[in-house]
Amino acid sequence: MAEENHTMKNEFILTGFTDHPELKTLLFVVFFAIYLITVVGNISLVALIFTHRRLHTPMYIFLGNLALVDSCCACAITPKMLENFFSENKRISLYECAVQFYFLCTVETADCFLLAAMAYDRYVAICNPLQYHIMMSKKLCIQMTTGAFIAGNLHSMIHVGLVFRLVFCGSNHINHFYCDILPLYRLSCVDPYINELVLFIFSGSVQVFTIGSVLISYLYILLTIFKMKSKEGRAKAFSTCASHFLSVSLFYGSLFFMYVRPNLLEEGDKDIPAAILFTIVVPLLNPFIYSLRNREVISVLRKILMKK
């Protein structure tokens, strides 16, 4: 009996979205289609950038890594979610929870820094085009990309490590479609104040620094666009920036709501819509927002299709 109770403390049940059979089938089809489009779209973009020397520039190196991160995000969350739609055993161990959150936190943190790097790259290209190759060298690009993944790993290690200081002795039902860290805090029998404080400080710092970099870069870009004499060039540049900024706003807005709001352990029912945005919707939209509006990518795709 003691062993069974101990097991219960370290296993959780993901309640997911709904228990209605009709809705389960519909949601499964929708999320499976989104998953396929997300993975195929992002991996295709990575392959396209990797195999064509014409795209081996800082802008596309960042874009390729962003696509890789988005596909990893989908793979970390969606398979288990799809399995749970029809599985009677929706259990997940504490260690599986830790692994799932580790990968999610790593890729989302890397995503933040990559978006900041991409915004800086566009700032240099539009505001200082003559100095682009000096200010945005391949060496700096590689350093920024590597730094994004190192920061992601360190950030996730801190939070995952602190999870193991908690004790779970009450309910083991997680009202979520994946094992996020906030529901674990709510189930803890030990006061998670330290975990909550560390999450607020580190997540807040990452997001404030990266969104600040993005906003400053886009502010300078907009000022430069408004100074353009060509109305056509101004409209094209503004249209591209607007679509990029929409993706950034959805991503950062949902992350801020999830992890940087006051009283993190309250309002658990509102976590799921925000989580859907940054784990499912944004990875789906990014390859289309960043590539289908890009002349270089479209040009390479046309050449490939013409050869076939």
UniProtKB/Swiss-Prot annotation:
Disulfide bonds join 97-189. Belongs to the G-protein coupled receptor 1 family. Gene3D superfamilies: Rhodopsin 7-helix transmembrane proteins (1.20.1070.10). Its main location: membrane. SUPFAM superfamilies: Family A G protein-coupled receptor-like (SSF81321). Odorant receptor. This is Olfactory receptor 5K1. GO terms for cellular component: plasma membrane. It is found in: Cell membrane. The lineage of its organism: Eukaryota, Metazoa, Chordata, Craniata, Vertebrata. It is a multi-pass membrane protein. Residues 47-54, 121-139, 218-237, 293-308 are cytoplasmic. Glycans are attached at residue 5. The gene is OR5K1. It comes from Homo sapiens (Human). Residues 1-25, 76-99, 161-196, 259-271 are extracellular. The keyword Transcription regulation does not apply. The chain crosses the membrane at residues 26-46, 55-75, 100-120, 140-160, 197-217, 238-258, 272-292. The keyword Zinc does not apply. Keywords: Cell membrane, Disulfide bond, G-protein coupled receptor, Glycoprotein, Membrane, Olfaction, Receptor, Sensory transduction, Transducer, Transmembrane, Transmembrane helix. One of its GO terms (molecular function) is G protein-coupled receptor activity. InterPro entries: GPCR_Rhodpsn, GPCR_Rhodpsn_7TM, Olfact_rcpt. Pfam families: 7tm_4.
